[in-house]
Amino acid sequence: LNRCFGIDLNHRFNPAHRLAKQWVEEGRLGHLLFINMAMWIMNPRESSPYFQLKALHPHTVDIMRYFCGDIEAVQCFATKAPGRKIWSTAQFNMRFVNGVVGSLTGSYDIARGHPMERCEVAGTGGRFVIEDIFKQVTLYPAGSLEKIVYTEPSLFGGMRDFVDTFRDRIKRFVQQVDEGVAPEDIDGSGADGLAAQKVLAAAIESLETETVVRVG
């Protein structure tokens, strides 16, 4: 049908993630080696045993793919916090098609108050860390005692809160549709959303079978 889909993968739609992506594309991290991703909030709702995996981690997996490419294999362990009936906290190990290795930790058991999200990507030339979605991004060049720190709001145009990530995501989608971008080239396309879901399906299978599962 040649339709454009703009999936609401809003967590990476902000200037901090775009700057970090620019560093990767410029080669400032060198050959990519690993990625560590974490996200946690308090969500007491109980539904599917895999609610936390399915609802929270399309965002985290999308961020990991944004920086490091497609994921080919997943291993997942999970636990239930006191009083929980669902798998409310999970740990993933991942291998990417390009050889990068990664870890992802997620939880519905920790109340917000301090930063809820962290992404670290490292390569032979250095690493970066994004704190709390868009609040701060730091570049650590390898072999250097110096670091480069960008802190919101001084650099990032006054992003006030999490709601601004939705505005950024919608603005980007409207801009690309207006420019006539092909469906497959949409940033946060339907294909990107499906790719994240395939990773999570493999993670659920891994949790059930206690094996490493290849992403279908």
Which role fits each region the language model picked out?
Residues A55, H59-T138, V163-A182:
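Contiguous beta-strand/loop segments that form the cofactor/metal-binding neighborhood of enzyme cores
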Residues G27, G99, E210:
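Conserved G/P- and acidic residue-centered "switch" motifs that form tight phosphate/ATP-binding loops
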Residues D8-A16, M39-Q75, W87-S88, D192:
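Mid-domain beta-loop-alpha active-site segment that forms a flexible
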Residues S48-K54, F156-D164:
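A short glycine-threonine-serine/GTX helix/turn-capping micro-motif
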Residues Q22-E26, F51-K54, Q91-N93, V121, ...:
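Short, hinge-like loop/turn segments at secondary-structure boundaries
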Residues C4, R172-G216:
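C-terminal helix-rich "cap/oligomerization" subdomain common to oxidoreductases
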Residues L19-Q22, I63, Q91, R172, ...:
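Alpha-helical elements of Rossmann-like donor-binding domains used by nucleotide-donor carbohydrate transfer enzymes
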Residues L1-P44:
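A contiguous active-site-proximal alpha/beta segment in oxidoreductase catalytic domains
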